[in-house]
Design a protein with these regions (language model features):
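Sec-dependent bacterial lipoprotein signal peptides
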Residues: 1-17
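Generic structural signal for isolated residues within well-ordered alpha-helices
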Residues: 12, 166-167, 209
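A non-transmembrane, solvent-exposed segment enriched in polar/low-complexity residues
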Residues: 17-166
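Flexible helix-coil transition and linker loops at the boundaries of alpha-helical arrays
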Residues: 166-173, 213
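Amphipathic alpha-helical repeat scaffolds of TPR domains
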Residues: 172-188
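Short coil/turn connectors between adjacent alpha-helices in alpha-solenoid helical repeat scaffolds
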Residues: 189-199
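N-proximal helix/coil linker or "cap" segments that precede and/or mark the start of modular domains
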Residues: 200-215
Length: 215
């Protein structure tokens, strides 16, 4: 009898865990027949695989995962292309994208924060392209090192001012503000609290609002 009771209790526990609050991500990826689509958790400690599906036909997909206790970051990945988004409640997100421009031409419904994250992603991509173009101009000897350094500083300062005003200080308690702090340019943090006192203020604003320790 005790053995049966224990087995029943274990089964109930497993059922309770599997049937708890969940979030759902669904949509379709066009032009991706036969491709693998991955759902991954994205954190400071790294990337963790959660689920995957082989896309067929029109590329419809649906993932369900336990709802996080606090805002967390996730991403969809196909090959080396990614779409970043956040989840902070029992949400249903719908993401549609073409395979070719997966990381930039997607649409997302059901999460205002995730749309802000898309805006930040597109801004970072544009910044990286401008820096790459500037570096190519230097390598072709079309500008001096002094002009390169000044132009690079202007690009970076303009970007940071835009993001600080419109994303970090405007709503420091959001996942988008947190996401902005950890964007990179050539694999270096754009906001660097270890080497820039003004950047420390950005981290402090978000940490205070979200009650976190970021630095």
């Amino acid at each position: 009898m005790k053995k049966i009771t224990f087995v029943a209790l274990a089964a109930l526990t497993i059922t309770a865990c599997s049937s708890g609050p969940k979030f759902e991500v669904n949509g379709d990826i066009s032009g991706a027949d036969g491709k693998m689509l991955y759902l991954e958790a994205s954190g400071l400690e790294g990337i963790a695989a959660l689920d995957s599906v082989k896309l067929k036909g029109e590329g419809a997909f649906s993932f369900k995962q336990p709802r996080p206790e606090s805002p967390e970051f996730y991403r969809l990945r196909i090959d080396d292309k990614v779409i970043n988004f956040s989840v902070d409640s029992i949400e249903t997100l719908q993401i549609k994208a073409p395979y070719v421009d997966f990381s930039t031409a997607y649409t997302i419904e059901g999460s205002g924060n995730s749309n802000k994250i898309k805006e930040l992603t597109l801004k970072q991509i544009a910044l990286q392209k401008n820096v790459d173009d500037l570096l190519a101009t230097l390598r072709n000897n079309n500008i001096s090192h002094d002009i390169f350094e000044d132009s690079l500083a202007t690009l970076l300062n303009n970007y940071k001012e835009d993001v600080k005003v419109n994303y970090i200080f405007a709503a420091p308690n959001t996942a988008a503000a947190y996401f902005a702090l950890f964007q990179k340019l050539n694999n270096y943090l754009i906001f660097d609290p270890l080497n820039n006192k003004d950047d420390v203020k950005c981290f402090a604003a978000v940490a205070t609002s979200l009650n976190l320790s970021l630095i």
